């Protein structure tokens, strides 16, 4: 994860073909051979770690409530697949342990995005979620394959302050396009190893703001993007210095990167 090659990451697994953040989506991404899987971590009311993007359950399960107000048993009983297709009816919300069991014996990199935010749930809850994730990562010996990601600079500063350089820190946006949920008293150029770049102006694209890529280069931050998988855009992002594409269509992203000579066949 040192930026020596351009990485292809599956955003919430193979979400183009399977319901996002479910074991079928992760299994497909692993089979396909992406470099990394990005996934989203929440903690339940009884302290278990689950993988689901939204804190609110409605979008992917059709049920009211939030991850932090439900027990693991309650969340595991929900259907996280039917919203995508009837074919995936009764697909459960996976746990972090279940996901690690899948990828542990591979060389898959993992981008763990911590989604419990201090401004919503308080420092204690958000930081405990981070600690439990890192304890689990260490228990399974996958530290060297894991990066810690969050929209909350407060969470990232906590992880960095407690664990130092044990994990690459992945931020979301820089000062000119700040989209973090909570700010922290640590300069982003000191905190971030990686940063997903966003447009400074709504409706435009990250590539419209080359100064953000230049900022990353100046401060030794590896830039990445999560954008539509189009050849012309990929060419421009590569020229600007992008080192990772977090893709919603891994098949198309892989095709483009191979055509550009940036992935082996």
Language-model-derived ranges and their functions:
Residues 1-265:
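Phosphate-group recognition and catalysis centered on beta-loop-alpha active-site segments
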């Amino acid at each position: 994860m040192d930026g020596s090659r351009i990485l292809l990451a599956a955003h919430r697994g193979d979400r183009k073909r399977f319901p996002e953040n479910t074991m079928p989506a992760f299994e497909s991404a692993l089979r396909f051979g992406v470099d990394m899987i990005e996934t989203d971590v929440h903690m339940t009311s009884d302290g278990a770690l689950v993988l689901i993007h939204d804190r609110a359950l409605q979008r992917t399960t059709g049920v009211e409530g939030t991850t932090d107000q439900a027990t693991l048993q309650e969340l595991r009983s929900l259907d996280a697949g039917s919203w995508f297709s009837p074919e995936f009816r009764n697909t459960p919300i996976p746990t972090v342990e279940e996901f690690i069991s899948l990828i542990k014996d591979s060389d898959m990199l993992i981008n763990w995005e911590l989604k419990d935010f201090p401004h919503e749930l308080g420092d204690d809850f958000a930081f405990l979620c981070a600690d439990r994730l890192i304890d689990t990562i260490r228990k399974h010996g996958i530290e060297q394959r894991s990066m810690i990601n969050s929209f909350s600079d407060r969470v990232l500063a906590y992880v960095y302050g407690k664990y130092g350089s044990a994990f690459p820190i992945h931020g979301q946006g820089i000062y000119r396009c700040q989209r973090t949920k909570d700010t922290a008293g640590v300069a982003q150029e000191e905190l971030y190893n990686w940063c997903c770049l966003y447009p400074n102006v709504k409706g435009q694209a990250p590539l419209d703001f080359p100064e953000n890529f230049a900022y990353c280069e100046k401060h030794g931050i590896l830039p990445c993007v999560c954008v539509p998988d189009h050849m012309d855009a990929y060419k421009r992002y590569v020229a600007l210095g992008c080192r990772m594409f977090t893709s919603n269509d891994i098949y198309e992203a892989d095709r483009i990167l191979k055509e550009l000579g940036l992935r082996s066949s």
